From Swiss-Prot:
GO terms for cellular component: cell-cell junction; COP9 signalosome; cytoplasm; nucleus. Disruption phenotype: Mice are viable, are born at the expected Mendelian frequency and present no gross abnormalities. They however display a blockade in late T-cell development with defects in thymocyte selection. The number of transitional CD4(+)CD8(int) thymocytes as well as CD4(+) or CD8(+) single-positive thymocytes is lower. Thymocytes show defective positive selection, resulting in fewer mature thymocytes. Negative selection is also impaired. A greater percentage of T-cells have CD4(+)CD25(+)Foxp3(+) regulatory and CD62L(lo)CD44(hi) memory phenotypes compared to wild-type T-cells. One of its GO terms (biological process) is T cell receptor signaling pathway. Transmembrane segments: none annotated. Plays a central role in late thymocyte development by controlling both positive and negative T-cell selection. Required to sustain and/or integrate signals required for proper lineage commitment and maturation of T-cells. Regulates T-cell development through T-cell antigen receptor (TCR) signaling and in particular through the regulation of calcium influx and phosphorylation of Erk. Residues 261-520 are annotated as: CABIT 2. This is Protein THEMIS. The modification Phosphoserine is found at residue 586.
Length: 636
């Protein structure tokens, strides 16, 4: 049965791609397809096309006035795909009437963003489990078991995860759960736009470093309706170029997938398709059909129409690093362990005594200089003046006399005097400031830094990597090594020179290749010379990595509150007095670099915060700009 192209797209289940279509009739010019504004706008009767994908071409947005449920929309405008804003996704109030509708409409996949949550209005009785009314159900993956398509789901009860499967035939009213996470527009486009539905979002933050004009009114942080405009991606018979068709093209099509030999079409694979391949299917020979512009890969590795060998896919480690500088924008890098440059240590800054406790190590005694004063009402605790030096040892609990006897967590240190040292006890709640004194002049390889020190760690390139023509790290004023990141890579080589291989990041490469049949492959991949490179990533990619890695580890406990309002008042007064006091000249003799204080998310002190905290960092920063710095709250 013939359908309009729009009707076909509306009913298309993306899990059934690719599909083969035959053009039945429509308004068009005779002859083959031709291109206008990057889209195919004409198809001949009888033309056969294999549909390989349905992508969002652009995003239209409408500003909502009033409540989300009954908002009046203003004139829609295009929201650029690279818009540097952060959004909160509002739950869709329209129910899904079956599991099949959810899987056909919502993106469910291996990504951390591909696990949507729904709840059901009634109890669902399973063989060994009862899903309660309103209980959040996480959809993890879709798979076929014994010929039946099932959805792998899970619920969490008392911190215990319970797994189960639901068939596509399961019916009922399923509603989206509230989502407290914050997303970029790119993430929403890829994972959070249900097919054939709009998405209401709330703008929570906007980067003022964007060069283009802000499409929103000044100080706007309201709700929007996002309306995607799709394009169909496909390939014509005997052609290797990808064609793009707008669903609004006035033609009728017929699905002939079951009766047509798909081998007449060249086999095109995207980066996602390569990711889904099993390890046994590698190596393969392929021709690059399309490659994303603006990638930071060496131009000689991947070019259009170049034949390459994709040897395998695997996980590899990178060190996430950021420039140490007081102004923005900062640059961010992924450094491979194979990097051959050498580093020297740079001093770290610590805003509280609690941060000193986290940073101390068994390898060496942490030596710091105070940059802010601290006065205490307790004789058992040590006052601090600007320029005081301390050797940090360990934390313990001590008793102080204040409205009775109470216990306080302290950091036991040695205060360095001219010729002697004296014991000092600094309360962990102390909101002072310290700069590290570096005595270590050794040059380190990146692998040595990984094994001998804890993140975050400050360094500067002392000897550049001579094996790299342009070492982008050598020009940086300093680097903060923040985290060890594990990511997915493809091992790729030039077909003409298969011995020299490169690690190519799968998640940051938008590439389409055509498999080349009949080409001989290298016999032994174990003899290949693997080359890695330092990858510069965007700020969006950086924050996504920090957010994901932070969600995998438990956060450290927050520093304890100040014990009394009186002492807080006295401390604040003393800090105000110290603002007029310059650092003593003697401090310069310690060869301490004193960069300006970094924001908390870049100094690394919050790098292990839970994902919810990381997601809300934009809101916090915006509040800080309006109302001044926010004080951390934590139990005693």
């Amino acid at each position: 049965m013939a359908l309009s192209l729009e009707e076909f797209v509306y009913s298309l289940d993306l899990r059934t791609l690719p599909r083969v279509l035959e053009i039945q009739s429509g308004i068009y010019f005779e002859g083959s397809v031709y291109e206008m504004f990057g889209n195919e706008c004409c198809l001949s009767t009888g033309e056969v096309i294999k549909i390989t994908g349905l992508k969002i071409k652009k995003m239209m947005a409408e500003i909502c006035e009033g409540a989300i449920g009954g908002c009046e929309s203003q004139k829609p405008f295009e929201l650029p795909m690279n818009f540097p804003g952060l959004f909160k996704v509002m739950a869709d109030k329209t129910p899904y009437l079956s599991i099949e509708e959810i899987t056909r409409t919502v993106n469910i996949g291996p990504s951390r963003l591909g696990h949507p949550c729904f709840y059901h209005l009634k109890d669902i009785k399973l063989e060994n489990l009862i899903i309660k009314q309103g209980e959040p159900i996480r959809f993890n993956s879709v798979e076929e078991i014994n010929g039946e398509t099932l959805v792998n789901c899970g619920v969490v009860r008392n911190h215990q995860s319970h797994s189960f499967t639901l068939p596509l035939s399961q019916e009922g009213e399923f509603y989206e759960c509230e989502d407290e996470h914050i997303y970029t527009l790119k993430e929403i486009v890829e994972w959070k736009i249900p097919k054939n539905r709009t998405r209401t979002v709330k703008l929570t933050d906007f980067s003022n470093k964007w060069d283009s004009t802000n499409p929103f009114p000044e100080d706007f942080y309201g709700t929007l309706i996002l309306k995607p405009v799709y394009e169909i991606q496909g390939v014509l018979k005997f052609q290797k170029d990808i064609v793009r068709i707008l669903p609004s093209l006035d033609v009728e099509v017929k699905d002939i997938t079951d009766s047509y030999d798909a081998n007449w079409f060249l086999q095109l694979l995207s980066t996602d398709d390569l990711f889904e391949m099993t390890s046994k299917e590698f190596p393969v020979v392929a021709e690059v059909v399309e490659i994303s512009q603006g990638n930071h890969l060496p131009q000689s590795i991947l070019q259009r129409e170049k034949t390459i060998v994709i040897h395998k896919k695997y996980q590899a480690s990178r060190i996430l690093a950021s420039e140490i500088r007081s102004n923005f924008p900062k640059r961010h890098f992924l450094i491979p362990i194979s990097y051959k440059g050498k580093f020297k240590r740079r001093p770290r800054e610590f805003p509280t005594a609690y941060d000193l406790q986290i940073a101390k190590s068994r390898k060496e005694t942490l030596h710091v200089v105070a940059t802010k004063a601290f006065h205490t009402l307790h004789k058992e605790l040590s006052p601090v003046s600007v320029g005081d030096q301390f050797l940090v040892h360990h934390s313990e609990t001590t008793e102080v006399v204040f409205e009775g006897t109470r216990k306080v967590n302290v950091l036991t240190c040695e205060k360095v005097l001219n010729k002697t040292r004296e014991d000092a006890q600094l309360p962990l709640y102390m909101e002072g400031g310290f700069v590290e004194v570096i005595h270590d002049k050794k040059q380190y390889q990146i692998s040595e830094l990984c094994t001998q020190f804890c993140w975050p760690f400050n360094v500067k390139v002392a000897v550049r990597d001579l094996s790299i023509k342009d070492d982008i790290l050598a020009a940086t004023p300093g680097l903060q090594l923040e985290e060890d990141i594990t990511d997915s890579y493809l091992l790729i080589s030039d077909f003409a020179n298969p011995e020299e291989c490169w690690e190519i990041p799968m998640s940051r490469l938008n590439m389409t290749v055509r498999l080349v049949n009949g080409s001989s492959l290298p016999a032994d991949a174990g003899l290949l010379q693997v080359r890695s490179f330092v990858e510069e990533i965007t700020e969006e990619q950086y924050y996504m990595m920090r957010r994901y890695e932070s969600s995998l580890s438990h956060p450290p406990p927050r520093p304890p509150k100040h014990p009394s309002a009186e002492e807080m008042k006295l401390t604040l007064l003393s800090l105000a007095e110290e603002r007029t006091i310059n650092l003593p000249k003697s401090l310069k003799s310690h060869h301490v670099d004193r960069p300006k204080k970094l924001p908390s998310d870049e100094s690394g002190q919050d790098s292990r915060a839970p994902v919810g905290f990381q997601n809300d960092v934009a809101d916090v920063e915006r509040q800080k700009s309006k109302h001044g710095p926010l004080q951390p709250q934590a139990p005693l």
